[in-house]
């Protein structure tokens, strides 16, 4: 079937004898149920559909319990130019399915899909908070308050305390400096900090700051609720796997729940750890022609999983007494490798560890030092 982004689903039923049945259905639930009943009437066994944004999800939910479904990457079933239409797309998908030319994408169980919704909502809220903080800092800079030049970041306690006071209507530098941490004052001098807090603040600026601060607080509240819900589900249904994942160096509750949300706990979907690494986009692409390697950049993959595991890799590269730290030192200082490439290599190793932990249901065991000299590829 070919799913469109508007209000139509093009169904093509292809039998082993070559008979073709084509029909167009709407996207409402009752219309999807009519389509399901028609497919049951014709004894359909396998169903293939393109992964079109999020439009495949409602169709999947209606058909999941009745058919063997395959979610197909559109990249693998591209049509020839000049032969492109919704009906022909449906025919082409049916033909590829019958001849077993395509494989289905990984679609986790319903509970893991629910965890994914929380996990990706958290990432969206993180990005939203960063954008709002940047806008808030722009308003502060417009008022010529230069405190951000002297604090570590715009999410620091001192910076937020000063913003809170300004939103309350306090604009005197002598009063605002009381909210700044003593270490910052000692480092840069009290007079310098007071001068950085002296600006031209209007009522409109205070109003906009108050609105932005309220939006940031709301986003942080929603983020905290999502974190609690995700953690509650994992502790209730995947407690053993959650505990085992947290034995990996620097992998704590947030990262462990994100790993479960993205890859699930059943590793039968990934035949080997290399399959999982490839799916996450942590392997070099195969771009070679006439014995010339054109590119070895990592591939596109699950960006949420890759983001989580790379963040963990940065921490693991600094975690003393563990293999990942020794590996990072050996590759960057002894072999003079690029640090970012080493981080990608560490993240791949950590993902392999996660695959083995979930597959064997065991805790993490650190690598031997001898691996450092034998494993030169990273």
Kindly label every feature range from the protein language model:
Residues 1-378:
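A detector of single, family-specific signature residues
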């Amino acid at each position: 079937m070919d799913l469109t982004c508007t209000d139509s689903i093009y169904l093509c039923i292809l039998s082993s004898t070559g008979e073709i049945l084509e029909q167009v259905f709407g996207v409402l639930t009752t219309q999807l149920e009519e389509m399901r009943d028609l497919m049951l009437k014709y004894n359909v066994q396998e169903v293939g559909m393109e992964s079109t944004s999020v439009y495949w999800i409602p169709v999947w939910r209606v058909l999941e319990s009745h058919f063997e479904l395959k979610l197909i990457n559109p990249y693998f079933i591209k049509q020839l130019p000049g032969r492109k239409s919704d009906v022909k797309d449906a025919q082409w998908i049916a033909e590829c399915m019958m001849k077993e030319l395509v494989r289905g994408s990984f679609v986790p169980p319903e509970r893991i899909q629910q965890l994914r919704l929380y996990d990706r909502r958290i990432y969206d809220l993180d990005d939203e908070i960063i954008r709002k903080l940047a806008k808030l800092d722009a308003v502060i800079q417009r008022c010529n308050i230069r405190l951000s030049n002297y604090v570590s970041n715009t999410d620091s306690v001192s910076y937020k305390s000063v913003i809170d006071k300004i939103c309350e209507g306090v604009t005197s530098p002598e009063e605002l400096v009381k909210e700044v941490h003593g270490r910052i004052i000692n480092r840069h001098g009290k007079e310098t900090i007071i001068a950085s807090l002296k600006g031209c603040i209007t009522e409109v600026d205070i109003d906009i700051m108050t609105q932005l601060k309220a939006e940031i607080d709301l986003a942080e509240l929603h983020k905290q609720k999502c974190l609690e819900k995700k953690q509650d589900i994992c502790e209730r249904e995947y407690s053993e796997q959650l505990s085992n994942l947290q034995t990996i160096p620097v992998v704590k509750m947030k990262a462990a729940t994100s790993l479960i949300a993205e890859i699930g706990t059943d590793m039968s979907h990934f035949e080997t750890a290399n399959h999982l690494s490839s799916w996450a986009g942590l392997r070099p692409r195969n771009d070679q022609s006439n014995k010339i390697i054109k590119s070895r950049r990592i591939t596109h993959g699950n960006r949420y999983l890759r983001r989580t595991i790379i963040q963990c890799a940065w921490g693991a590269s600094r975690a003393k007494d563990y293999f990942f730290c020794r590996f990072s030192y050996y590759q960057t200082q002894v072999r003079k490798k690029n640090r970012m490439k080493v981080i990608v290599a560490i993240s791949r190793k950590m993902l392999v560890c996660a695959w083995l932990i979930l597959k064997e249901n065991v805790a993490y065991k650190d690598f031997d030092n001898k691996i450092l000299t034998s494993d030169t590829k990273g």
